[in-house]
């Protein structure tokens, strides 16, 4: 049904663009209203807003690298991942609805990351989750979209494994 697949594509596009918009809006708000390094306690002992700039990759890896190719390589890799995600979604190879929604969220998060690297040469992180003095790495909404998307893809894989002869939803 062409109408159904067009609607599905539109819905997945809205999910991706929604994740991208939420990510970029939140980063703009943090960059506009807080100084780099500033800390705001949101929930004592659990959640802070900390404005940081990460020129590296996940968990700050390669942030201290002086290699002039770091930025272009990260952008090139990100664009390749984005192209693969678009191809998977466009060709219907994402599995069922959970897998498609998951890949759409990952796509939105990846777009947010590559846009940051292209425009700012770094990624703005600001969410600091912790329990007492035990802090997780600071992250942003693009990271959240990618992690949530990956969880949905894994759930889709479990669903497919539990019902191998069932058509993807």
What are these regions (language model features)?
Residues 1-169:
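Alpha-helical transmembrane bundles and membrane-interface segments of multipass inner-membrane proteins
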């Amino acid at each position: 049904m062409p109408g159904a697949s067009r609607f599905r594509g539109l819905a997945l596009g809205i999910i991706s663009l929604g994740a991208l918009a939420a990510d970029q809006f939140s980063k703009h708000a943090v960059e506009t209203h807080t100084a780099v390094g500033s800390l705001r306690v949101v929930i004592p002992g659990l959640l802070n807003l900390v404005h940081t700039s990460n020129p590296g990759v996940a968990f700050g890896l390669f942030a201290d690298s002086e290699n002039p190719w770091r930025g272009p390589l990260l952008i090139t890799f990100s664009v390749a991942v984005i192209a693969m995600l678009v191809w998977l979604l466009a060709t219907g190879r994402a599995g069922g609805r959970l897998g498609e929604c998951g890949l759409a969220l990952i796509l939105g998060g990846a777009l947010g990351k590559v846009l940051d690297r292209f425009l700012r040469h770094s990624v703005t992180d600001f969410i600091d989750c912790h329990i007492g003095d035990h802090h997780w790495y600071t992250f942003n909404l693009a990271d959240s979209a990618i992690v949530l998307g990956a969880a949905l893809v894994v759930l889709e894989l479990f669903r497919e494994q539990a019902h191998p002869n069932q058509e993807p939803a």
